[in-house]
């Protein structure tokens, strides 16, 4: 089993662990119900999600098999 050659100092350990910080989630206001929600996600309160389409959508024909 591998063992370290030298002891890591407390300062070196602290410098390594300083990168373990958490980030605050980026919340925006829902345009439909004005509650806070995550970006690019469905609103948990009202279920609203704005999708912008560029250009016209092509219709898809669904064939039913009888």
From Swiss-Prot:
SUPFAM superfamilies the record matches: Zn-binding ribosomal proteins
Q: Give the family from UniProt.
A: Belongs to the bacterial ribosomal protein bL32 family.
* Superkingdom per UniProt: Bacteria
Per its UniProt record, what PANTHER family does this chain match? 50S RIBOSOMAL PROTEIN L32, LARGE RIBOSOMAL SUBUNIT PROTEIN BL32
NCBIfam families (alphabetical): rpmF_bact
Under InterPro entries, the record lists: Ribosomal_bL32, Ribosomal_bL32_bact, Ribosomal_zn-bd
Q: Does the keyword Ribosomal protein apply?
A: yes
Alphabetical keyword list: Ribonucleoprotein, Ribosomal protein
Please tell me one Gene Ontology term that the record gives under cellular component.
large ribosomal subunit
**What name does this protein carry?**
Large ribosomal subunit protein bL32
Question: Which GO molecular function annotation, any one, does this entry have?
Answer: structural constituent of ribosome
> Which ranges form a coiled coil?
none
Pfam families, per this entry? Ribosomal_L32p
Q: Name one GO biological process term.
A: translation
